[in-house]
Amino acid sequence: MQRIGKYDIIRRLGRGGMGAVYKALVPEIDKVVAIKLLQPGELLETMVGLEQLEAIFLFEARTMAAFNQPFLVTAHDFDRDHQGRPFFVMEYICNNLGEMIGETFTLEEPSRIIAAEKVLGYGRQILRALDFLHHHRIIHRDIKPQNILVTDEDTLKICDFGMALVQGVSFSGPDNMQVGSPYYTPPEQRKQPQSVDGRADLYSVAVLLYRMLTGQLPGMQS
């Protein structure tokens, strides 16, 4: 069985520009966790540099480790694998809103519609999480369905803080790094990603709620 540090890998859950997320097991206590491992793509590593990417990754882990809020995913361990690549450990949650609504990679395809009452409850949870983040001067900058995990009890938890900006902190990623996801990102964030405030996250939430209610993205023809 493949291992990352002391953790037994069960399977890979997904992969992004900076790395991969795995479902893993703590063998001593038979507990399932999620592991995010820094595995940047060649293009991103060339553009940004491995040292800078490791700094961003550590910044994400430290930010998540400081959370104590029911609607945010918390990091609770950090280490390096046998190749020296950094990883951090989080609670494992098997579902996300992207899977729930059936959002495809191309985004243009209509998604499943969720009942308005449930969307209202989801919206409250997301906004409570953002209220906590913004109170601590943290701007997520990548709110989208795939970054909202859904527990078996229907509790939402925001994850993936690799693009987060902490206002007043000198380091929050390089200026030349593209931040956010198509359709969910406000225009000002695409132009000046280091200058946005909490309103950028609220824009993304509005798009997300619209998507769940209508199955469409703003500007898409029905």
Q: Language-model segments: which ranges?
A:
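Conserved N-lobe ATP-binding subsite of Hanks-type protein kinase domains
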Residues: A20
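Activation segment signature within eukaryotic-like protein kinase domains
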Residues: Y122-G123
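A short, aromatic-enriched beta-strand patch in the conserved N-lobe beta-sheet
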Residues: D77-D79
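AlphaC helix of the eukaryotic protein kinase fold
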Residues: E42-A66
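Conserved short submotifs of the Hanks-type protein kinase catalytic core
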Residues: Q83-N96, M100
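Protein kinase catalytic-loop region centered on the HRD/HxD motif
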Residues: R128-I138
